[in-house]
């Protein structure tokens, strides 16, 4: 079974020769041209013989002209939609095209998109939207609608560059930021705007970041797989698989990945297989692995899979 078949079967909950696996981290190349980013991603994919590539995307969303950060109601009102051919997307799209040319016939790849809320938070002065929600709710909602439209346009272009879907990262679907009821206003409509743009893609993943996540209220999102830090927040991996009926990506505790021994990593892989029966499972961390994770620990993931399924 080749990499593409293995991932597609896992997403459908069908039999696989072994569960596919992958992992990712922030390369810190957001100040480099897209070609350098692509080279790092391709080298990483080949070095660890991953079953698919989750492409990191750390290039910043542009601020309105003349602003260093968004702070006032008028600032939020100045946020307008950005088309897919805007220069701000160029480095990442160039990287995706190069990745497709290099590995597109061997494996699927998906691009990371941070949710409209997360994107807005990064634009705000101090990275905090609490004051904007309280003092300028209509202006913030309007800005988020523009951001969602921009990200939806970008997501469609991602597919045109050869990606099989997107990895939509939600940073506020957690009680640590807001309630599920509040997220229904401030997050959900804008998330769905982005996902609707790529609804027909075969490999869309929802990453629910943080602890105390709103898992149950997100189960109707149109994605093929779910990813969350199940070692640090409910539900457990097997429970999430049963509740959602979707494929799950997990098994590896990213918070401890840099410090575990190979036998401890093997235990995590075995536990994931036991919880899910190995169906509808992609072995992966619940979030990015630390950049100081030793090579031997990353290689131990594949070795554990091979031993368990041989």
Language-model segment annotations:
Residues 1-22, 51, 55, 84-310:
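Active-site loop segments of alpha/beta catalytic cores
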Residues 8-11, 15-78:
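N-terminal capping/small domains of soluble enzymes
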Residues 69-83, 130-135:
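Glycine-/small-residue-rich beta-strand-loop submotif within the FAD-binding core of flavoenzymes
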């Amino acid at each position: 079974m080749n990499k593409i078949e293995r991932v597609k079967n896992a997403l459908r909950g069908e039999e696989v020769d072994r569960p596919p696996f992958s992992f990712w981290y922030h390369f810190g190349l957001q100040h480099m041209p897209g070609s350098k980013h692509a080279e790092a991603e391709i080298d990483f994919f080949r070095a660890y013989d991953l079953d698919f590539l989750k492409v990191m995307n750390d290039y910043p969303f542009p601020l309105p002209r003349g602003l260093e950060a968004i702070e006032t109601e008028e600032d939020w009102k100045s946020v307008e939609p950005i088309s897919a051919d805007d220069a701000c997307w160029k480095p990442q799209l160039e990287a995706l095209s190069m990745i497709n040319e290099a590995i597109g016939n061997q494996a699927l790849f998906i691009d990371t998109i941070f949710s409209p809320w997360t994107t807005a938070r990064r634009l705000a002065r101090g990275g905090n939207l609490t004051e904007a929600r309280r003092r300028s709710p209509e202006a913030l909602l309007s800005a988020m609608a523009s951001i969602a439209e921009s990200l939806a346009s970008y997501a469609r272009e991602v597919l045109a560059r050869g990606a099989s879907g997107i990895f939509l990262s939600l940073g506020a679907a957690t009680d640590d930021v807001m309630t599920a009821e509040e997220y229904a206003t401030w997050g959900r409509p804008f998330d769905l705007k982005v996902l609707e743009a790529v609804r027909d893609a075969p490999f869309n993943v929802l990453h629910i970041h943080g602890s105390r996540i709103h898992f149950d209220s997100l189960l109707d999102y149109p994605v093929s797989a779910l990813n969350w830090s199940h070692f640090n927040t409910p539900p457990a991996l097997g429970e999430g698989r049963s509740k959602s009926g979707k494929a799950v990506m997990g098994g590896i505790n990213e918070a401890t990945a840099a410090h575990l021994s190979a036998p401890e990593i093997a235990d995590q892989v075995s536990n994931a297989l036991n919880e899910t029966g190995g169906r509808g499972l992609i072995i992966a961390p619940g979030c990015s692995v630390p950049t100081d994770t030793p090579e031997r620990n990353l290689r131990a993931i594949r070795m554990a899979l091979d031993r368990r399924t041989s």
